[in-house]
Amino acid sequence: MPVNQAAPLLEHTLIDLLNDMRSRAQVAASSAERISLTRDIALCSLAFYSMHRSYDLSFTLGCQILKLPNCRGLIFNFQFDKTLRASSEAVVVLAARDCPAVCAFRAVTAYILAAKRMGWDLTTGHLFPVVAAGGHRSNLPLPAARMTTALQAHLRVAGLPSHFTMQSFRVGGSLSKSLVGTAVDEIIQICGWKTESVAKCYIGATSSGKVLGSKRTRGQSYASASELPLSPEFQKYLLACARKD
């Protein structure tokens, strides 16, 4: 069944958007505006590089995040309700990157630190809450529909095309990975797609399992070039944390 695919938002557009949002956050007139922008910077970065649905991000909890040793990155243990996906959970590693403009790890950690200065404790409750009046933290998660409304407003302010939706990050992120040679198996695992046929609708994967420009094929081991290996001890710690209620 064909996917009603959103327009892909690619990395160069993301960089322009995030740079504009960071500039606005620095001169924000209120604490509520500043933390809202900082939250949305983290949200957009995470949506692109994790390639997860806005609904998943809306209900992501602070307790589902682990920080890798020596500031090497973050581990997200996304957990889902009953869905048509391959699994009810997905572990995604966001490794620190050299370029601050496109480093989702830095964007998320900057948001967590900014929230802490506001008196928010993001280790409990939703990671991306609604910002209430006065910059207070609401107990409600930021709804997926509101994420798209905010995204399009940010795009208009930045002078960028505003037809994108939150799904555009998922499409653009997966397409960007395919264009640099990432194997289809890896993209399927990160995105949580159930079958390769779904991946084809997004990234044009071939029936042999290759993606545009890919040097790897199906059957080869999953190893992301952007992810750092975990020690056996830390893997055990991660699994123990991921299984907690």
Which positions does each model-derived feature cover?
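Extended, non-catalytic subsegments within catalytic or DNA/protein-binding/adaptor domains
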Residues: 1-245
